Amino acid sequence: MPRSGRFSIKAKNYFLTYPKCDLTKENALSQITNLQTPTNKLFIKICRELHENGEPHLHILIQFEGKYNCTNQRFFDLVSPTRSAHFHPNIQGAKSSSDVKSYIDKDGDVLEWGTFQIDGRSARGGQQTANDAYAKAINAGSKSQALDVIKELAPRDYVLHFHNINSNLDKVFQVPPAPYVSPFLSSSFDQVPDELEHWVSENVMDAAARPWRPVSIVIEGDSRTGKTTWARSLGPHNYLCGHLDLSQKVYSNNAWYNVIDDVDPHYLKHFKEFMGAQRDWQSNTKYGKPIQIKGGIPTIFLCNPGPQSSFKEYLDEEKNQALKNWATKNAIFVTIHQPLFADTNQNTTSHRQEEASEA
């Protein structure tokens, strides 16, 4: 117990205010980090603020590893590097480091050092309620920032309910799949059979013009014939290659059509839903909640010849006779025997695009 009149503050978190202090944040940080203390500094946040009369102030939050007993009221004094001037702060122990951190964040002109330390008082944040914490998270600019807010203001929820929080924030801050940009102009595909061109004109279009039950198409042909690049050049689409990922990060319900590329038909989940352009169906995921698929769009199935790839060979299997009868009513089957482009056309287009990107 200190004697009456003796200066003493013992705390893990210190809140310092320097009135009429014209030091830069960087200079103040350098001086604070060089102060020798028996317990390590873990986090420092500095805010430079201009009051209405134009005078600059500095607010500083310091978090120590353990409680630091300050008995020298001049210990945190700062000095000007350019003139004979000392800056003496108001020194307080910060009961809620989150409240102080939020307060000095308000003007935005801040500088941080170290890692902010979350504790029980920070979680309560003074009068901070759970609703306030989650409201601040929703208003954050990104999922990572929202997680940081919840970790700081609601650490119990962060630890006990992280899976649900993480999943929900994926939806709140959903980033639509980046639109595909074809490396070739559509005009470079100058060897496309009329059957394919006709199918595109009847089925690949936006929702307003699309048939209620569009027809899908299976295109079989050798590798390097341009099947994939042609199929992906027709408009906004979902591209599923090797396996099906219907998560929101990959699959968009606003696409005009699907492209399913190089998926063994023996293991193709939702065969009928895709080929039949079915509407409003669900896909059950192994570790998550069912995904609702809007559907109603055609699918281009791309495959090579062979028993583990060809849809025709798969449907010709005796056990799949009923499925074959259904498939022929919901899709057309086209086999291509030559590239969908002339070599010179593709090369010329590629060179032109490279030149345009370099210009």
From Swiss-Prot:
Motif segment (RCR-1): 15-18
One Pfam family it belongs to: Gemini_AL1_M
Function: Essential for the replication of viral ssDNA. The closed circular ssDNA genome is first converted to a superhelical dsDNA. Rep binds a specific region at the genome origin of replication. It introduces an endonucleolytic nick within the conserved sequence 5'-TAATATTAC-3' in the intergenic region of the genome present in all geminiviruses, thereby initiating the rolling circle replication (RCR). Following cleavage, binds covalently to the 5'-phosphate of DNA as a tyrosyl ester. The cleavage gives rise to a free 3'-OH that serves as a primer for the cellular DNA polymerase.
Protein's UniProt keywords contain Nucleotide-binding: yes
Domain of life: Viruses
Motif annotated as RCR-2, chain positions: 57-59
Motif RCR-3 positions after renumbering to this chain: 103-106
Region (Oligomerization): 156-176
Source organism (scientific name): Tomato yellow leaf curl Sardinia virus
Co-factor note (free text): Divalent metal cations, possibly Mg(2+) or Mn(2+).
Listed name of the protein: Replication-associated protein
